[in-house]
A protein has these predicted regions:
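Alpha-helical transmembrane segments and their immediate juxtamembrane cytosolic regions
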Residues: 1-370
């Protein structure tokens, strides 16, 4: 249940980070989302890593679970974006093509905008495959967890160094850099599970105090710990800043998750959010769009939202309406970004059940012996 709470916080950080303010839970900037939130996801996923048979069957299993939904929703959003551009006057997203349908989900992932968060799915798939290969090779060093983590850390350090050297342009393709940068955090999940969790017994108050002090000192030492993993840019903090910052953030929120776990276990909504992180990552921008549609209708009816910008709605992918300039309304986008994907997940789950019932074959009657 601790990791349910951890996933809950991680996905809330992701959605909040995509709103206009994007800093509701950063502790006044001490834990900036873009310095750790995707590492937090990778860490949680790594904690639950397990090999699934042979390497080939392992890859196929992960592709079925991650890539098939990715491509399916990419098609849905591509068609939806085309319809909105053709009939709704929108200027967001790129046209349908073989590239946007087949290659863009893995080399970019931000092309149709309304499913922008889906770029993370292919790197996560690659991380799982790479780490599976490393675990199979770990027999060479007798499955020593420290060595396994170091082997996973080295590619990440190299990738971050290349990002830092490249400035505003990554020196290697995004589909190579993204998973390599995430790999140490994913490996850290298994390191924690197999070597550190049993020793994680320090009392909470001194534990959190030490982590906060170290994080504050790191923030003073490093100019900016935040970076843009989606584009592999703004890595001014270098490998040490990236991974030390991620480790301290994970340590902090892992202990917070332990405190929240009993309460999360009693909340159906919290559990639902933590169990549907794929759907929320995929659809939260559409949740923002749905809320903007509500404001648009209110504006057209003259009920409220008189300063809602229809032009910005149609041309700006990140447009969040602030009624009367009150940015506090940003929380509505956070709520919409969490609840709308849950509704999508609920509907798709019901459709899957219905499809299975329709396609389920009835047992063939045995031939009569007479």
């Amino acid at each position: 249940m601790v990791f349910r709470a951890l996933y809950l916080m991680a996905i809330v950080f992701v959605v909040d980070g995509h709103t206009t303010l994007g800093d509701m839970f950063t502790l006044d900037g001490l834990f900036k989302y873009y310095s750790f939130h995707l590492m937090l996801f990778a860490f949680g996923a790594g904690y639950f890593f397990r090999m699934r048979g042979s390497l080939a069957s392992d890859i196929l299993s992960r592709a079925k679970r991650l890539l098939l939904p990715l491509y399916g929703w990419n098609l849905v959003y591509g068609i939806g974006a085309a319809v909105l551009r053709r009939f709704g006057g929108f200027e967001i997203g790129v046209p349908l093509s073989a590239y946007t349908l087949l290659l863009a989900p893995i080399v970019d992932g931000e092309h149709f905008v309304w499913n922008l968060g889906s770029w993370f799915i292919f790197p996560l798939f690659c991380v799982q495959v790479i780490y599976s290969c490393i675990r199979r090779a770990a027999k060479i060093w007798k499955d020593n967890e420290i060595i396994t983590f170091i082997v996973s850390l080295i590619p990440g350090v190299i990738a971050v160094s290349l990002c830092s050297a490249g400035g505003d342009e990554p020196m290697l393709p995004l589909f190579v850099m993204r998973p390599l940068i995430l790999l140490p955090a994913y490996a850290g999940g298994m390191l924690y599970k197999n070597a550190l969790e049993a020793r994680d017994s320090m009392p909470t108050v001194p534990y959190l105090a030490i982590v906060v002090i170290l994080r504050a000192l790191l923030c003073v030492r490093v100019e900016n710990l935040a970076y843009l993993l989606s584009n592999c840019t703004y890595f001014v903090c270098g490998p040490f800043g990236v991974y030390a910052g991620a480790a301290l953030s994970i340590a902090f929120f892992l202990r917070i998750a332990r405190l929240l776990a009993p309460h999360v276990a009693k909340s159906r909504l919290a559990l639902s959010i933590s169990r549907n992180t794929f759907a929320i990552m995929m659809h939260h921008y559409m949740g923002f769009f749905a809320l903007n549609c509500v404001f648009l209708v209110m504006n057209m009816l003259g009920i409220w939202a008189g300063d809602f910008s229809v032009r910005s709605f149609r041309t700006q992918a990140h447009y969040n309406y602030a009624p009367g300039g009150h940015a506090e309304f940003n929380v509505l986008y956070l709520i919409a970004g969490l609840l709308f994907p849950l509704a999508v997940a609920f509907v798709t789950d019901r459709l899957k059940v219905l499809f299975r019932r329709i396609t389920k074959k009835r047992p063939v009657a045995a031939p009569s012996s007479g």
